[in-house]
Amino acid sequence: AEVSKDDKDWNHAAEWDHAARFFWNTVVNHRSVCIGGNSVREHFHPSDNFTSMLNDVQGPETCNTYNMLRLTKMLYQNSGDVDNSNKPDPRYVDYYERALYNHILSSQEPDKGGFVYFTPMRPGHYRVYSQPETSMWCCVGSGLENHTKYGEFIYAHRQDTLYVNLFIPSQLNWKEQGVTLTQETLFPDDGKVTLRIDKASKKKLTLMIRIPGWAGSSKDYAITINGQKKKYAIRPGVSTYLPIHRK
């Protein structure tokens, strides 16, 4: 539903934003497991005791993660406006990446295309995939969308700044800025990422490359620009963006 500025509830937008961020922080930091999924049968267990999830034959539903990814994307898009920094918060991308690779990517059967409903956390357990005409779960409906969305969050932009969020082989054609960029990588099997600007106008451009919170210290990665190694200091464990300016 659309909300106009004449709507009496428009003034509550800040409250809604605060509530959404509180919910996101609670789920991601206190209710989620390593794959980025959460809950069993869409019910949270105690935040300080995951035993029931580890013992259950069911587990996080992919449609829960699907909705968390949607929320994450919206909060990311609005994050620079909330604190007036005009800078998106890369912490949202850290979670998006974790859930995308560890839960969503593994949720489709590679040969017959069935979709996973539950992803059990029980050690040594198995997953059940949907079958045509017998399995139309909620996670099948959202699953049809999940695997068409791998390209939608790789890049983002604000004004003349381009953000490289995810390390996925891709090509970007930014028509407004006259920039064509190619990304080559085998991530997560290999940590090397190559960004090549194939076409560029004379317009001012800032390239913001995400340094994930899991990247560790500066000793754990190296950056080469036009064949020359560059040194950048980062805080270990803190997700950030590394700026490269072209005037």
Question: Could you say what each language-model-derived stretch is?
Answer:
Residues A1-K247:
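Glycan-recognition and catalytic cores of secretory/periplasmic carbohydrate-active enzymes
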